[in-house]
């Protein structure tokens, strides 16, 4: 649980989900019920913390979910998006994703 209030999945490189926002695709580094961290990629328009973003999250197990949230933080190598209430990932979906990853990557923790 990493001392957090919610369970977080840190993805193995070969199973990272993808976020699509318009014509741009980003790799997901980790996710929880309330947020996702994506690998940074330069955009033609600079984004600032607090910016509303929306798109599609394709989980490793194949489920695709639309999302809306706000850019919480920009780091040198990643962005953190806080998901809006209706876009949050239900805990059963997080557990299903975890089971999927464990079945495909037995050494993954």
Where are these regions (language model features)?
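Conserved RNA-binding domains used in RNP assembly and mRNA/RNA metabolism
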Residues: 82-91, 96-97
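N-terminal helix initiation/capping motif
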Residues: 1-33, 39-44, 95-109
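Surface-exposed connector loops and short turns at secondary-structure junctions
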Residues: 43-51
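Short beta-strand-centered aromatic/proline hotspots
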Residues: 25-28, 65-72
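Generic beta-strand structural signal
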Residues: 31, 73-76
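Non-catalytic surface loops within mature trypsin-like serine protease
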Residues: 13, 42, 59, 85-87
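Short, solvent-exposed secondary-structure boundary/capping segments
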Residues: 36-40, 75-86
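Short conserved beta-strand and strand-loop elements enriched in small hydrophobics
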Residues: 14-21, 50-64
